[in-house]
């Protein structure tokens, strides 16, 4: 493993998210740590197709922060404080936006610096993708993000990932730098940026982010007929019928499970939670959520 004692990346500055300066540091043909997972198809927040259209200056659907994102920002300082209390060996410092010393297009904004290591801070609403504290089990898109940060700043010492799984389950993970993974991400980013320059968008995938991006591309409405190719028409009709059938089957399965759950909260099977009930104040069911 290659190590570094100080960042070799170039600090562009510390910017408040959402400000013109913050947007300036991220705009154009560059790839940030929060974007790399989308490029390799692992981001739950964005598809490569949507990101491509943003980079190409084409329309995209308006961004709306989810409650999970908003609360994650609010809890960030609290989680950082817990990490600092448990690890007093070095001060835990806020930092800014960096670019790679040789690759101007490679950008990252880590949450904190701790000595010569990065610290990324998260919150989560459930523990399904998170292993025990100290394990190597956590969401893959965060691994992409942290690897990109390590590679951008040149800090190849193991990074730390601190997460608060709501309401009060605090866990930590150590993320080793992997040069093979970093090279794979760089190559994917270079191909992606080249496709933007060449005007060749990624293939259409099944993400809602991709669908919503396509939805806002038309700038007018022409009352005309358009002949659709056979494979596209067939997929739409056949898969649409299958979707209707499976939706009805799934609704039936939910109804049966909810009836079996009664007034309870967690639906268990052989010691494993498979769903949980969210109740209104009067005890009636507001939602039945799958365990994730």
Describe each model-derived feature in a short phrase.
Residues 1-292:
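Accessory terminal regions of nucleic-acid processing enzymes
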């Amino acid at each position: 493993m290659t190590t570094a004692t100080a960042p070799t990346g170039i600090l562009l500055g510390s910017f408040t998210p959402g400000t013109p300066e913050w947007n300036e540091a991220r705009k154009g043909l560059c790839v940030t740590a929060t974007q790399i997972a989308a490029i390799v198809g692992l981001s739950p927040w964005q598809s490569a197709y949507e990101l491509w259209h943003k980079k190409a200056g084409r329309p995209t659907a308006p961004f709306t922060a989810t409650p999970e994102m908003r609360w994650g920002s609010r809890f960030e300082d609290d989680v950082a404080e817990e990490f600092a209390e448990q690890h007093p060996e070095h001060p835990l410092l806020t930092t800014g936006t960096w670019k790679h010393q040789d690759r101007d297009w490679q950008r990252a904004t880590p949450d904190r610096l701790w000595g010569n290591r990065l610290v990324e801070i998260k919150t989560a609403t459930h523990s399904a993708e998170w292993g025990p504290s100290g394990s190597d089990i956590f969401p893959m898109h965060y691994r992409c993000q942290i690897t990109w940060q390590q590679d951008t700043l040149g800090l190849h010492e193991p990074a730390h990932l601190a997460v608060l799984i709501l309401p009060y389950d605090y866990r930590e993970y150590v993320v080793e730098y992997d040069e093979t993974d970093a090279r794979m991400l760089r190559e994917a980013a270079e191909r992606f940026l080249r496709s933007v320059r060449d005007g060749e968008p990624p293939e259409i995938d099944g993400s809602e982010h991709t669908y919503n991006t396509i939805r806002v591309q038309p700038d007018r409405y022409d009352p005309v007929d358009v002949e659709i190719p056979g494979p596209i028409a067939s997929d739409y009709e056949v898969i649409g019928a299958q979707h209707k059938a499976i939706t009805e089957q799934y609704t039936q399965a939910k109804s049966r499970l909810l009836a079996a759950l009664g007034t309870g909260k967690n639906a268990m099977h052989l010691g494993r939670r498979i769903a949980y009930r969210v109740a209104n104040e009067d005890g009636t069911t507001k939602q039945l959520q799958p365990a994730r």
